[in-house]
């Protein structure tokens, strides 16, 4: 089975809100709109941390140096239009100010066309929303831990 390596960020602000991006996805054949953590695919020759630094620049227009190790690894099976694959996702914890300036200027054209929104979420908002977000359980567990330190 094919494996797609992805580097992703749990971006938290000083109030332990998490930054999520709303995208539409159609790689499984059906259109799905959901909130996800920033990040993306690891390119040949990149470490996961290097890939995340590049992805955060492309998707958010921010320069971040990943200095800490990963906090979570998930292997998520998908049945896509081109067959089955596993999304091997490595997550890092990143702190940013809530008033950080973000830019979509460096986002790839295909991503710009499927991007809907960017939002800081509280734990309470995520518990109450009917919107889909992933990885749901990991995000909720992270925000329930009130003594997160980076």
Spans of model-derived segments:
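A generic structural micro-feature
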Residues: 1, 31-34, 82-88, 110-115
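N-terminal strand-loop-strand
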Residues: 1-36
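Short, well-ordered beta-strand micro-motif
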Residues: 11, 93-95, 119-122
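Generic short beta-strand segments
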Residues: 22-24, 70-76, 97
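Nudix hydrolase/Nudix homology domain
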Residues: 27, 101-150
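The catalytic Nudix box helix
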Residues: 37-71
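Hydrophobic pocket-lining residues within nucleotide cofactor-binding pockets
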Residues: 42, 96, 123-126
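Active-site-adjacent beta-strand/loop module that shapes the phosphate/pyrophosphate-binding cleft
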Residues: 75-104
